[in-house]
From Swiss-Prot:
GO terms for biological process: diaminopimelate biosynthetic process; L-arginine biosynthetic process; lysine biosynthetic process via diaminopimelate. This is Succinyl-diaminopimelate desuccinylase. CDD domains: M20_DapE_proteobac (cd03891). It comes from Thioalkalivibrio sulfidiphilus (strain HL-EbGR7). Its cofactor is Zn(2+); Co(2+). Zn(2+) 2 binds at residues 99, 134, 348. Pathway: Amino-acid biosynthesis; L-lysine biosynthesis via DAP pathway; LL-2,6-diaminopimelate from (S)-tetrahydrodipicolinate (succinylase route): step 3/3. InterPro entries: ArgE/DapE_CS (IPR001261), Bact_exopeptidase_dim_dom (IPR036264), DapE_proteobac (IPR005941), Peptidase_M20 (IPR002933), Peptidase_M20_dimer (IPR011650), Peptidase_M20A (IPR050072).
Amino acid sequence: MSDTLDLAQELIRRRSVTPEDAGCQQLIAERLAPLGFEAHHLRFEDVDNLWLRRGSEGPVLAFAGHTDVVPTGPVEKWSSDPFQPQIRNGQLYGRGAADMKSSIAAFVIACEAFLKDHPDHKGSIALLITSDEEGPSVNGTVKVVEWLEARGEKITWALVGEPSSTERLGDVIKNGRRGSLSGVLRVRGQQGHVAYPHLADNPVHRALPALAELAAIQWDEGNEHFPPTSFQISNIHAGTGAENVIPGELEVMFNLRFSTEQTDEGIRTRVHAVLDAHGLDYELSWRLSGHPFLTAEGELVEAASAAIREVMGLDTELSTAGGTSDGRFIAPTGAQVVELGPLNASIHKIDEHVRIEDLDALSRIYTGILKRLLVE
């Protein structure tokens, strides 16, 4: 059994459903303390965060990850207890196996291997670990980044351990992410009887043309790194539940995933212009989850690509597809950011799992990145 597998199982046994850490960060800190990592345990409200650093000089290579996991769903539908890791058919099963306790284990073991051969490496190695990535993400990485900035500490390269691979380990790495902007629209009308529509004002009827116009907009054509901006309505609610009552208010929830071709300010302005043009009586609240970011090909992308080629014998694909990650909080500091981790096919699902053979391979890839950035 490998050290990476052992540590991954130890982490999975801890029931760290967001925002709980369940002792994972303490385990990581204790494991790395003998190697010279200085630990800062940072608690913001109900969220545990950990900043570990070895070295005081730049450049700084930081691994960013999260110990929290999503809820299991119906436990009876799992083939085994989601918090009792099981090995079956060459796979490690358990909540967090792919997202992303195996990545954390792989980087810890990579640090041990790297420092055994290169105790006098240049720069610094760091880990930024939070228990608030799967939840609101307001007291996790973003707060640690603010804390680092206040201390004058700067990350040069951020290696985010999110499960980026699709068919084979390392076949895809994320070198950017789209921005995410959500809106909650409330359109006011006047409630009334469906038989007397002239005595009421149906907000559904009023809003539908505007919503159709928003859904039909071609916001942009994307670019070589990003797909076109997407507008999606996720929820619509109106009425009392009775079939003979015209509703007095309509609530619509929507989201835009936008590329570097757009700004959140520009999107907001255009949405308001459409709603105003249709004469709606409305209020609209916004929530920006993150701006789009892109790490162009440079030291980090090159180091990751070369390490994958060395260990896996394949050329990786750069991608910005998918949802957001905590990389969105680190990129604005000027750091180069890539996401590299195991296969993502089972994340958040019943019977989440990861290939056992990929665990040590991922650790060797991480070791290769450390060597290329802090030795060569």
